[in-house]
Swiss-Prot record:
Database matches in SUPFAM superfamilies: ATPase domain of HSP90 chaperone/DNA topoisomerase II/histidine kinase, DNA mismatch repair protein MutL, Ribosomal protein S5 domain 2-like
General function of this protein: This protein is involved in the repair of mismatches in DNA. It is required for dam-dependent methyl-directed DNA mismatch repair. May act as a 'molecular matchmaker', a protein that promotes the formation of a stable complex between two or more DNA-binding proteins in an ATP-dependent manner without itself being part of a final effector complex.
Name recorded for this polypeptide: DNA mismatch repair protein MutL
Source lineage: Bacteria, Pseudomonadati, Spirochaetota, Spirochaetia, Spirochaetales
Species of origin: Borreliella burgdorferi (strain ATCC 35210 / DSM 4680 / CIP 102532 / B31) (Borrelia burgdorferi)
InterPro entries: DNA_mismatch_repair_CS, DNA_mismatch_repair_MutL, DNA_mismatch_S5_2-like, HATPase_C_sf, MutL/Mlh/PMS, MutL/Mlh/Pms-like, MutL_C, MutL_C_dimsub
UniProt keyword terms in alphabetical order: DNA damage, DNA repair
Length: 610
């Protein structure tokens, strides 16, 4: 007796229905896709009990003819493709011919439609079987009424959530369709009550209308780019808005919501220099790509897509977002929302400082040869605090270069070709009141009824980073090439893939053997940092989020900047603060916030004076 047998046709249809229809929101998605594909300019949606009891869709689209209505619920019937060639350039939301047949198998469905103004027809289907077909008064478009969802799928029905959760899932589907089709009027009704009407509008107005509350009704910034067969439109939140999850990163490809890890990473990467680790951007990406270069025939619900050239697309998105923030960092005025302090916020308690406070706070440029490996954040844990203090003050009096020499060392021609900070008569003075340095880590500044607590390492790091990026660069060939090796195959593959990019940065690397390379030429701005470069190459365990150039400059800036526990002179501190305000610095090259500020009013409120 044969163990392998043909399945019953009805059973096959039930299995297929279970793949594409798993809950009411799946039915809603398929019906909305059909309405949109029909060219509708108005869609009315009625949901009862989260779609569990009833889903009713009314549209003014092109309608379904009498002949097509008789077969539209059968498996693999569709008006959207007719050949394999059509599958290679899909321009509609639906194309498989599975939606209506799957819905008809797991529920009762009634479809009333017309293609003329004279008459319409209605078909009623239960459990995939036609029960009624009749003539009806003329309507403009199509009405689809779905009831008794999963009545013949008891296991599936048991796993449905409570009404509020199913409603929320349906609203999420509606949101995806509303946001991607601003040219359509949508009317949403829940449990026979009007919930919301969205009128025809531009995409930017629709995004602002739907998602504006996420950024407290501030305005999104819009980035538009076109490249060959790709159009990109990205809606970016102001810099001061971020989230602790990726929930507000949404990607749409040819008006479809797509869950694509690579696109999410590209967006996150583009924001990397303005967001600290653990924070994610608020961003909505809309891609329009020639259908011949993408494949939607991957996932039953079309939530995934294959791209013809994903690495190029990844770089295009990431680099454009990065460049957008670079260009706007100095001229875009953020709308700052006044942050109300919570009871958990702590103000740094300031004590009266002695008159010679600023005179004691001098900064000694590190002169050791271990600059590349110096710990940025923590002193040696085995060293007591008293030893740290003693060593710090000893460094001030033992053969210390003058402050003027120190500043000259940082910004002289032989270091990164930085101009020396202009003197007081030449430089752009910004009015502020420097209060002092605390914890050997933060600079405190008063400016226009606000107090700033500025991270000294982060602000100096950002200043150096910006100077590096904007400085004139010349190639410098090493008299003796520096050989180095890498520890594993993964790093070797990454360096091999990046060699051409290094050449564009005037960094010439040659491979001289398995896992062995030699550094032959470098830009003049890196002339003192060969060891930093080598360490940078040897730590490339993955392609990082920024461009190679940004990664490298961030590494050099981090090594060169003043550190925590460095004592700074008043003059040098004021120089950093002036640059901080002049450049409107907000984040370090790694995305961490550089400062915290509190207004006079907030401070007075904290001590019950307001």
């Amino acid at each position: 007796m044969n163990k392998i047998r043909f399945l019953d046709k009805y059973l096959v249809q039930k299995i297929a229905a279970g793949e594409s229809i798993d809950r009411p929101c799946s039915i809603l998605r398929e019906l909305l896709d059909n309405s949109i594909d029909s060219g509708a300019t108005k869609i009315e949606v009625f949901l009862e009990e989260g779609g569990i009891q009833k889903i009713l869709i009314i549209d003014n689209g092109s309608g379904i003819s009498k002949e097509d209505l008789k077969i539209c619920y059968l498996p693999h019937t569709t008006s959207k493709i007719s050949s394999e060639e059509d599958l290679r350039k899909i321009e509609t939301l639906g194309f498989r011919g599975e939606a209506l047949s799957s819905i008809a198998i797991c529920s009762n469905i009634s479809i009333t439609s017309s293609t003329t103004s004279n008459e319409s027809y209605q078909i009623e289907v239960e459990n995939g079987i036609e029960k009624c077909f009749k003539k009806q008064p003329a309507i403009n478009g199509t009405i689809v009424d779905v009831t008794k969802i999963f009545h013949n799928f008891p296991a599936r029905k048991r796993f449905l959530k409570q009404e509020p959760i199913e409603t929320k899932m349906c609203l999420k589907v509606l949101e995806e369709k509303i946001i991607t089709h601003p040219e359509i009027n949508f009317e949403i009704n829940l449990n026979q009550k009007l919930r919301k009407i969205y009128f025809k509008e531009s995409l930017i107005d629709r995004v602002q209308n739907v998602y504006g509350n996420v950024i407290e009704n501030n305005k999104f910034r819009v980035l538009k780019k076109e490249h060959d067969n790709i159009k990109i439109e990205i809606f970016l939140a102001p810099d001061n808005f971020s989230k602790k999850s990726k929930r507000h990163i949404k990607t749409f490809v040819n008006r479809r919501p797509i869950d694509q890890k690579d696109l999410l990473e590209a967006i996150t990467n583009g924001h990397s220099r303005i967001l600290s680790p653990g924070n994610f951007p608020i961003c909505y990406l809309f891609l329009e790509i020639n259908p011949e270069y993408i494949d939607f025939n991957v996932h039953p619900q079309k939530k995934e897509v294959r791209f013809y050239n994903l690495p190029f697309l990844f770089k295009l998105i990431s680099d454009n977002i990065n460049n957008f923030f670079d260009k706007n960092i100095n001229n875009y005025q953020d709308i700052i929302i006044k942050r109300q302090l919570t009871e958990d916020d702590h103000l740094i308690e300031m004590t009266n400082q002695p008159e010679n406070f600023n005179k004691i706070n001098t900064y000694d440029i590190p002169q050791n040869n271990n600059l590349e490996t110096e710990d940025v954040n923590e002193p040696n844990k085995n060293t007591t605090q008293s030893n740290i203090d003693l060593r710090r003050y000893n460094s001030i009096i033992q053969n210390r270069p003058t402050l003027r020499e120190n500043i000259g060392n940082i910004f002289s021609d032989n270091f990164l070709e930085f101009e020396e900070p202009p003197n007081k008569n030449e430089k752009e003075e910004i009015k502020f009141n420097y209060i002092g340095q605390i914890f050997s880590e933060f600079l405190i500044v008063e400016k226009i009824n606000e107090i700033y607590f500025i991270d000294q390492h982060a602000v100096h790091e950002k200043i150096i980073y910006e100077k590096l990026r904007n400085s004139k660069k010349n190639v410098q060939k090493l008299l003796v090439p520096i050989e180095f090796t890498v520890v594993d195959k993964n790093i070797e593959e990454i360096i091999d893939s990046e060699i051409e990019e290094y050449k564009q940065m005037d960094i010439i690397i040659s491979k001289i053997g398995p896992k062995k390379y030699q550094l032959e030429s470098i830009p003049n701005i890196c002339s003192q940092y060969e060891n930093t470069l080598i360490n940078f190459f040897q730590s490339r365990r993955s392609r990082t989020i920024n461009s190679l150039e940004s990664d490298l400059y961030a590494t050099i800036a981090c090594r060169k900047a003043v550190k925590r526990n460095d004592m700074l002179s008043a003059e040098f501190s004021k120089f950093l603060i002036n640059e901080f305000f002049k450049l409107e610095i907000k984040h370090c090259p790694h995305g961490r916030k550089i400062y915290y500020k509190i207004s006079k009013f907030e401070l007075e409120k904290k001590v019950d004076r307001a």
